[in-house]
Amino acid sequence: MSLVSQIIINADDELRYPTIGELQSIQNYLITGSNRIRIATIIRDKEKEIIQKASKQIFQLHPEYIAPGGNAAGSRKRSLCLRDYGWYLRLITYGVLAGDKDSIETIGIIGVREMYNSLGVPIIGMLDAIQCLKEASLEMLGQDDAKIISPYFDYIIRGMS
């Protein structure tokens, strides 16, 4: 749900108009609208490059993952890891576009830790992978855009911790 929708629903539930603070939040969100669209476009267009950089970094941090018997050993397992990286990037862009973290919570965080545990995927590796995706993404963006997108990566990292 978008920031605007959430504010309206909250105000309606309480039978009131949006507060000054809520209206300011909407105004800030609308002011950054073109930036949010640009960020989502850059991440979409640079997805392969971001994943390539992040995977190189994560496998340098954890070479045991691509060693025989590792969670990303072999082309099939490795491609599944990279698929997940693309999924997380899309999830980040949904949050950026919506202006809140509800879509990340609804689509991606609930149950993900348990899923990875059941599959034998080390959580520390996924946390490191999201951090690597963040760093690779930030290389593609300016400082102002980094301030907008960073909290969404951090939210996923905290949610998986």
UniProtKB/Swiss-Prot annotation:
Binding residues for (2R,3E)-phycocyanobilin: 81
N4-methylasparagine carried by residues: 71
InterPro entries per UniProt: Globin-like_sf (IPR009050), Phycobilisome_asu/bsu (IPR012128), Phycobilisome_asu/bsu_sf (IPR038719)
PTM info: Contains one covalently linked bilin chromophore.
SUPFAM superfamilies, alphabetized: Globin-like (SSF46458)
Highest taxon of the lineage: Eukaryota
Keyword vocabulary terms for this entry: Antenna complex, Bile pigment, Chloroplast, Chromophore, Electron transport, Membrane, Methylation, Photosynthesis, Phycobilisome, Plastid, Thylakoid, Transport
Gene Ontology terms: biological process: photosynthesis
Family classification: Belongs to the phycobiliprotein family.
Protein name: Allophycocyanin alpha-B chain
